[in-house]
Amino acid sequence: MNAESLSVVLAGGGTAGHISPLLAIAAALRDVRPDVRLLAVGTPSGMETRLVPAAGLELATISRVPFPRRPSLDLLRLPGRLAGAVKQAGRILDDAHADVLVGVGGYVCTPLYLAARRRKIPIVIHEANTRAGLANKVGARFSHHVGVAFAGTKLRGARHVGMPMRREVSGLDRAASRHAARELLGLDQHKPALIVTGGSSGAQSINRTIAASLDALAKAGIQTLHITGKGKSVLDGEGKPLAADGYRQVEYVDGMENVYAAADLLLGRAGAATVCETAAVGIPAVFVPLPIGNGEQALNAAGPVQAGGALVVDDESFTPEWVSREIIPLLSDPARLAKMAASSEALGIRNADRRMADLVLEAVSK
């Protein structure tokens, strides 16, 4: 490695869950090494094609090579496709004169891990989920520098570093930002605020239950900001956007830090980023894990729930009756909310981006 210039290739993409920590790690590397040369690698069809350039990073792409989980023709084609992707990855690493590869998971990472191993380029990995993905399980076999967002993640050589997140979130002072955030989001400064989100893709079952709970929430003096997800506005019986006293819906909020500052209680899915961010900033939460997949979201929520910073309810049990029984009394109890906030914040990690940057520097110094 040239002492004057560090070349880092960052691999990952497909979803915001991979891209957000990648961008946070990149920003932290720029802080500790202002002369660093950064190149992100993703696929041509993922969200990274929009988010990475918007963050001021150069993006290279390679072919997407999913691993079939059942016997099929795609499984027979896998060796050839993977070999082609590894060649593409190798050319990218060579052209970048890469000193280190940082992978955050996703289809793009496996070929890059294999290409880096052949070139004896150090590999640094971040795993965002409680259950590690296949690509990072492969990469961890070749790496001594593996960071995980959740302490219980089983991955070879893992160190618990937390979830790298945007500085606007990790540096948030909820109390100091509360007034301005509520003003921005159109919320009353004095009423308790429930903010509901299903994530970037929305959550129709959550939306339905909240719509059926609005009268009870309003009668209890609770205001609700409902972030429905793009293209998923909640409609009334006449096909118009639902309206009610103390209720406002938007499809999307750009900047979750304002949501975290304004809310007394957050209700949503238990994606890795949401769970880690709510813990880091110390916000009480109700998690409704996504009822599909391998139960990963329920595992994500386990830590904050056990610590007393969050409640969890399965999707089928999340009904208007549950809202009346659990959420309304909670939002009417400031002392309990404050205790949950303290428990949540005690569990959170705000400097995961810097921890990962230090891991990268450690890898290249070996």
Swiss-Prot record:
Q: What is its EC number?
A: 2.4.1.227
For biological process, the GO terms are: carbohydrate metabolic process; cell division; cell wall organization; lipid glycosylation; peptidoglycan biosynthetic process; regulation of cell shape
Q: Does the keyword ATP-binding apply?
A: no
Name of one Pfam family that matches: Glyco_transf_28
Membrane topology annotation: Peripheral membrane protein
Q: In which pathway does it act?
A: Cell wall biogenesis; peptidoglycan biosynthesis
For the ligand (UDP-N-acetyl-alpha-D-glucosamine), the binding residues are: T15, A16, G17, N129, R166, S200, Q297
The reply on keyword Isomerase is no
Task: List the GO molecular function terms.
Answer: UDP-N-acetyl-D-glucosamine:N-acetylmuramoyl-L-alanyl-D-glutamyl-meso-2,6-diaminopimelyl-D-alanyl-D-alanine-diphosphoundecaprenol 4-beta-N-acetylglucosaminlytransferase activity; undecaprenyldiphospho-muramoylpentapeptide beta-N-acetylglucosaminyltransferase activity
Q: Which InterPro entries match?
A: GlcNAc_MurG, Glyco_trans_28_C, GlycoTrans_28_N
Keywords assigned by UniProt, alphabetized: Cell cycle, Cell division, Cell membrane, Cell shape, Cell wall biogenesis/degradation, Glycosyltransferase, Membrane, Peptidoglycan synthesis, Transferase
Instruction: Name the reaction it catalyses.
Output: di-trans,octa-cis-undecaprenyl diphospho-N-acetyl-alpha-D-muramoyl-L-alanyl-D-glutamyl-meso-2,6-diaminopimeloyl-D-alanyl-D-alanine + UDP-N-acetyl-alpha-D-glucosamine = di-trans,octa-cis-undecaprenyl diphospho-[N-acetyl-alpha-D-glucosaminyl-(1->4)]-N-acetyl-alpha-D-muramoyl-L-alanyl-D-glutamyl-meso-2,6-diaminopimeloyl-D-alanyl-D-alanine + UDP + H(+)
Subcellular compartments: Cell membrane
**Can you cite an annotated GO cellular component?**
plasma membrane
Question: HAMAP family attached here?
Answer: MurG
Family of this protein: Belongs to the glycosyltransferase 28 family. MurG subfamily.
The free-text function statement in the UniProt record for this protein reads:
Cell wall formation. Catalyzes the transfer of a GlcNAc subunit on undecaprenyl-pyrophosphoryl-MurNAc-pentapeptide (lipid intermediate I) to form undecaprenyl-pyrophosphoryl-MurNAc-(pentapeptide)GlcNAc (lipid intermediate II).
Name this polypeptide is given: UDP-N-acetylglucosamine--N-acetylmuramyl-(pentapeptide) pyrophosphoryl-undecaprenol N-acetylglucosamine transferase
Question: Which species expresses this protein natively?
Answer: Arthrobacter sp. (strain FB24)
Q: Which gene encodes it?
A: murG
